[in-house]
Structure formats: C-alpha cells, structure tokens
C-alpha cells in the first residue's frame, strides 16, 4: 500500500490546498495509521507577497512549516525539505532553519530538493556539523537525467518519466 505522502506548501490549484485536502483525508480516514505513514512537505517557492514569502530564509522556512502543519492538522512531519536552492540566502541560514525544525520537534528529518551537486555537498556538510539528520535528496531523475547518481546520498525522484 501507499505509506508515503509527498506534499509541499505550494501544491494545489491554490497554494496550500493539497495540504488542506490531505489533512482532511488524514483526519477522516488515515489518522489511525499515522505512525505507519511517512508524511513529507517542502517549502521554498512563493507562498505570499513580501520579502519573506519565498526562497530559503529562516523566517520563511519556519513560518511555512508552521502553516503546513496547521493545514494538515499535524504536530510534526517525518521529513521537511527545502524545495530549491536560494541564490540570496546564506546556505548556513537555510540549513540552520532546517536544523531548528528538527530541534523543535516539528520535523523528524530533513531533505533537500533541486540542489546542484556542489551546493548539495556543502549543505550536507553543514547539516552534519549541526548534527541534523539529513536523510534524502529529491531531484529530477530519469533515463535521460542521471546527474544525482554520483552524490552518494539516498534519493527519491520526481518526474522519472521524461
């Protein structure tokens, strides 16, 4: 059966609507299985207007996670991903926000999505120094795009069919 649910703060026809719908289904049908489920969410794309409604600042990531948890009716997610590299925010700030999510109990593990190999390696080192459980790398992967094979990390793919 299906045990992993991969969500993001901006998924759905309206940003956040996928999490709202998932939260309703979890409450009505799947709640008794919560301990058997892997629920993940991501933040990194635009959610609201203003300087902190996008990318990878500490303020944006932690506010987005709080909003995601509220929409889904959860106290924590199993994996919280940063959805894409941020060219403006220092990597240490972004990784620090992910580590804070784990330290606060709002995420059990962290993941990264859409990071290039060099930045991914740097981020993994920072997270390791912070003793933050970085467990997965989510990138595009297909027969035509195998660039993530060489990073030595566990991975999950999106768009496996071209």
Residue ranges and their predicted role:
Residues 1, 55-72, 120-124:
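Short, acidic/polar
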Residues 25-38, 69-73, 100-102, 124-133:
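Acidic (Asp/Glu)-rich catalytic clusters
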Residues 47-62, 83-89:
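Active-site mouth loops of central-metabolism enzymes
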Residues 5, 22, 39, 68, ...:
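Conserved, mostly hydrophobic/aromatic
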Residues 89-162:
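Beta/alpha (TIM)-barrel catalytic core signal, keyed to glycine-rich beta->alpha loops juxtaposed to Asp/Glu
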Residues 1-37, 103:
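N-terminal binding-site loop/beta-alpha segment at the start of enzyme catalytic domains
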Residues 8-10, 42-46, 82-85, 112-118, ...:
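Active-site beta-loop-alpha junctions enriched in small/polar residues
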């Amino acid at each position: 059966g299906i045990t992993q649910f991969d969500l993001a703060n901006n998924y759905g026809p309206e940003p956040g609507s996928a999490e709202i719908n998932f939260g309703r289904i979890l409450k009505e049908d799947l709640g008794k299985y919560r301990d058997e489920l892997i629920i993940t969410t991501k933040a990194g794309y635009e959610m609201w207007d203003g300087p902190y409604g996008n990318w990878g600042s500490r303020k944006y990531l932690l506010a987005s996670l709080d909003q995601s948890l509220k929409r889904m009716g959860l106290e924590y997610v199993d994996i919280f991903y940063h959805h894409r590299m941020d060219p403006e925010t220092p990597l240490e700030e972004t990784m620090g926000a992910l580590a804070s999510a784990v330290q606060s109990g709002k995420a059990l593990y962290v993941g990264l999505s859409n990071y290039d190999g060099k930045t991914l390696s740097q981020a993994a080192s920072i997270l390791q120094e912070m003793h933050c459980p970085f467990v997965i790398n989510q990138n595009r992967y297909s027969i035509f795009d195998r660039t993530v094979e060489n990073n030595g990390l566990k991975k999950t793919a999106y768009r496996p069919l071209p």
